Structure formats: structure tokens, C-alpha cells
């Protein structure tokens, strides 16, 4: 996945609709979008403990909501009481209150960056085109090796209770939330509004 396409989807409002259907939804809530994209300016969710996860179609860098661990100066345990799950809940409510019917494909409250897709199976097949257990085992072992490194490098348990630089993600910090429309898979689509960072 190209770095400029990496993203975490905080809320998918809808999918599999025509461009005119999407435009009608956008037109109905355009004036409400800045409040949604700026929401993280005053509602700051922190994600920690990066790990690589995978399923049959992709690899992702996943995080969990912070719970007071590895606090940096100026941040208190109370600040972590507002979590990524609360952010998703509130964005859902803001969307619904704006008149949108939220029809997400994925409702599991995951916080992940898709970093790679399994597009072709040939890399994990033998010379006959069948799945190769040894290649699969090697892939899983490499993922487990990377996860061991991530935990050792970035988790507070392995760093005297601190989180080294690069070990946490503060949602909306650099740019605020991005609201997009169109073919959004893999970070594509058109930008409607970019929230303010903090």
C-alpha cells in the first residue's frame, strides 16, 4: 500500500451506491461535515500497541485504544477515558443526527491501517498452483517475528512504561479527520473536507 494512501477508517457511512446517490447524501449534510471532521480537535483518542494482523485478503497494522499507559507530558489518565470506540460511536451519532442512515460494510470497531493486500495467490502456491503449507508457515512466522519486534520496540511493557516515538497514534492530530467520497478503497476517492489537527 503506498504511504500516501494509508488511512484508518473511523466511519464508513455507506457503500455500493451510484455516484448520484452518494452526491444526494453529501448535498444533504454538507454543512454538517466540518463538525464531524473537526471532532477530534476537542475529542482526542489515542491508539497504542501496534501489531500486524492478517486475514485471507490483507495485512494490517492494528492498534488498541490507550488506557493510561505511557502518558506523555501534558496528557493525563483521564484523557484516555475518551477512546477510539467512543470516537466511532460519536461519529456514528453525528452522522445519524445529520440525517444519514449509516450502512457500513464493517461494523467491528477495528483501528487498523491496511498495509498490503493479497491480490495474487501465486506467491503462496507450489509449482502446481496449490496452496503451499511451507510458504504459508514462513509468512506467518515472519509476521510473528515482526510482531515481536513491534512489541519490544514500541510497547510500554518493554520500555520502562514509556511509549517510544512512533509507538502511538493520536487520531486527528496531524490533519484532523478526512471526509471523502467516491471510490475510497485503498485511500482513493475525492476529498470533501479535511478537519483541523491539533
Task: Give residue ranges: language-model regions.
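Histidine-dependent nucleotide/RNA phosphoesterase domain, centered on the 2H-phosphoesterase fold
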Residues: 1-198
Amino acid at each position: 500500500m503506498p504511504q500516501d494512501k494509508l488511512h484508518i477508517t473511523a466511519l464508513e457511512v455507506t457503500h455500493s451506491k451510484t455516484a448520484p446517490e452518494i452526491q444526494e447524501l453529501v448535498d444533504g449534510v454538507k454543512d454538517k461535515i466540518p463538525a464531524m471532521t473537526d471532532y477530534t480537535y476537542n475529542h482526542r483518542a489515542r491508539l497504542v500497541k501496534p501489531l500486524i494482523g492478517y486475514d485471507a485478503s490483507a495485512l494490517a497494522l492494528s492498534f488498541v485504544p490507550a488506557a493510561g499507559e505511557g502518558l506523555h507530558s501534558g496528557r493525563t489518565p483521564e484523557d484516555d477515558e475518551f477512546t477510539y470506540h467512543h470516537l466511532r460511536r460519536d461519529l456514528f451519532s453525528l452522522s445519524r443526527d445529520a440525517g444519514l442512515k449509516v450502512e457500513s460494510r464493517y461494523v467491528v470497531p477495528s483501528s487498523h491501517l491496511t498495509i498490503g493486500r493479497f491480490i495474487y495467490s501465486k506467491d503462496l502456491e507450489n509449482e502446481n498452483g496449490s496452496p503451499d503449507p511451507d510458504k504459508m508457515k514462513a509468512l506467518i512466522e515472519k509476521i510473528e517475528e515482526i510482531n515481536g519486534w513491534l512489541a519490544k520496540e514500541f510497547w510500554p511493557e518493554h520500555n520502562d512504561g514509556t511509549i517510544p516515538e512512533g509507538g502511538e497514534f493520536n487520531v486527528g492530530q496531524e490533519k484532523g479527520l478526512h471526509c471523502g467520497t467516491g471510490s475510497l478503497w485503498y485511500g482513493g476517492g475525492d476529498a470533501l473536507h479535511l478537519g483541523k489537527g491539533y
